[in-house]
Amino acid sequence: MNHSAVAQTGLYLLVLLALAWPLGRYLAALLEGRLAQRFAWMGRIERGILWLMGAAPDEEMGWKRYAAAILLFNLAGVVLLFLLQRWQGMLPLNPAGLEGMSADSALNTAVSFVTNTNWQGYSGETTMSLLTQMLGLAVQNFLSAATGIAVVVALVRGFVRSGGGAIGNAWLDLLRATLWLLLPLSIVVALVLVWQGVVQNWYAGLTISSLESHTTQLLASGPVASQEAIKLLGTNGGGFFNANSAHPFENPTPFSNWVEMLSIFLVPAALVVMFGRMVGDLRQGVVLLAAMTVLFVGAFAVVYLAESQANPLLTALGAAGDSGNLEGKEVRFGVLASSLFATITTAASCGAVNAMHDSLMPLGGGMTMLLMQLGEVVFGGVGSGLYGMLLFAVLAVFMAGLMIGRTPEYLGKKIGAPEMKLVSVAILVGPLLVLAGTAIAVLTEAGRAGMANPGAHGFSEVLYAFSSAANNNGSAFAGLSANTPFYNLMLAVAMWFGRFAVIVPVLALAGSLAGKPRLAATAGTLPTHGPLFVVLLVLSVLLIGALTYIPALALGPVIDHLQLFSR
């Protein structure tokens, strides 16, 4: 990498950690209940809202009740969002007069936004009414992110608590995450984006006069900034416009691009700091942050180096410049900012894009795909990134214990066969959905019909789609025509089970750990707060990804790269 890439990446990480550290302390105080005790008015607001919901604020839940509450809450979200999309043509705040969506597309979109995936098989500005955007999609952007936070806090409590098996109150955790974290942050970020030029209005569109042809043109508009903020802070990723954050109404300036990149990683990084404070050892959080940072920097280096090369097909035509691969990228961002954004959005389960990933060089696109396939644990989604990395931490401790004869133990909790079964299920769900879904798609006529490109690149488009859906990312290789009944239903299944078939084992693990005593460290305990454990954790993540996905990646991005550079 050149000096500019190193400087920009280093500055980004420094600013991110500077913001995440105090936010992590705030999160620990908030979700442990210390803020509500200190500020009585916060407690009164929480109790009032929970009373309206019919929930008891002081009631502790076991993992089964906690999981049932999370599942029912999100299932209700799917039903309501599905109906809102189907009936939007009859509802107000629809100045463009848009009709309701088809049943399969509405189901796909409802599952997509409820699961924090935000996969979009439609063009937002020509499909969704303002009411659907605000009351449906934006609301689920908050609630899906709050769900991830609630689940990871429950898991952290499992490590902290001793005996009893209670892991908290799901309704209170959801409320606190939404009301005292996501909403205030979104207001601040939305105001910054409006200052930079992101639109925020209730118009059907803006009519302008063209300077060149002297004709009028209607530019789609709406409440973009408010949705853009939570789309990024909640690692949701679904854009108001089809071009997502490449659209100048969503991301007009290099500074707004910088703010958007910071917003994606801010809460995931802060949650890791929160974890260290809640378990009483900040070093444990620092180790996870270090492992995430190592994986992120390595991935960015691969993407940037790949995109710094000109496309050999354009070079042969004499059409390639000296700025690298600019196909599918906005000139106002260039190769460096586009590569950094692409790495961030696929490392987190965000999926927002400021460049077209289908136009990335094969190795660049392959790396963004691999980041998703690793389980979105490199900072990852809000909540899901941390609980995913904690699963790998437990796995790393268990493997180390088997190799050196030490008792598998993490944060004072013994790791036995029941815990490892739950960890294994949670880790293997994603690969099963990705590989099985891709296989079904390429073996059926309906699946192959959506592939716009033949050969390795067409296979990569399908593999990317299922990797994105099953790992709740939402970005796409847009050459795949995915708004069909086949892909809408297949990807909806991948998104739902990719989210909740992981959440349920994670909550079961939390309940199992919470019922165990927390033991003091002994000479036989593997230290999990030093550089050695960082290396072990990174290798565990890469080992699972390599063993699982290398054959599929070889058939897609690797062959695509070899074919491109052998011409």
Swiss-Prot record:
Family matches, as InterPro entries: KdpA (IPR004623)
Gene Ontology molecular-function annotations: P-type potassium transmembrane transporter activity; potassium ion binding
Cellular component terms (Gene Ontology): plasma membrane
Compartments in which it is found: Cell inner membrane
PANTHER family assigned to the protein according to its UniProt record, in alphabetical order: POTASSIUM-TRANSPORTING ATPASE A CHAIN, POTASSIUM-TRANSPORTING ATPASE POTASSIUM-BINDING SUBUNIT
Cross-referenced NCBIfam families: kdpA
Identification of the protein by name: Potassium-transporting ATPase potassium-binding subunit
